[in-house]
Amino acid sequence: MLLRTLLWGSIVMTAATLQAADADTRVYEMRTYWAAEGKLDALNARFRDHTTKLFEKHGMTNIGYWVPLENPDRKLIYFLAYPSREAREKSFKDFLTDPQWQKAQRESEVNGKLVDKVESRFLQVTDYSPAVKPAKKGERIFELRTYTTTPGNLGALNDRFRNHTLKLFEKHGMTNVAYWNLMPGQEGADNTLVYILAHASKEEADKSFAAFRSDPDWVAARKASEEKAGGSLTVPEGVKSVFMRATDDSPIQ
């Protein structure tokens, strides 16, 4: 009996160790660039020909690069990953002082700067996110969704996604790509969920969401979670959606 107990304890500890080893503890960064008027193509070309390679040279992992399907603001949205915030700071410092980058930047900006504005947010994957890794699966579109929760309800929202929403998305033909919360110390860190889905097309996305919203399992899960929280888990207009296409050099396509 004692031997059996010890063996069982060893198995449990081994499983826990493996689970911890598999946990993605990387720091993610979501970067949004607003290209200067008429410069989005040149910006994408600079990333394709120079920037992504130099990021990798300096220890940064390219996760994915996207542009919105409707893009009047000329946005480029991309994600990087690093072992830590300290590693991120060192990598960017080395990148910015790399003569190859300085030459590429100088030559690409002969006729003016390519970027008007940059926004950065640091993220950590949720414990229910699929593994974030390169994937090229043919023609498809992506959807970046950002949720802002009512006060104190980010945990409840994560619980609902973990226990119900992801499975129902897959049931209705949507692909879960990645899920993140903001890292502490940033505005919105206690109330923001950011995630990416993939769809066969915009039309298929609309069909999938219509079927999802009318699914009795979703209706029940939503009702139960909102009754427990005493109301909606998200603020009014707290769900933002951007449909995107991957750039031709994006590791996730």
Task: Please give the residue ranges for each predicted region.
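Short S/T/G/P-rich N-terminal loop/turn motif that feeds into the first structured element of a domain
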Residues: 19-253
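Bacterial N-terminal signal peptides
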Residues: 4-15
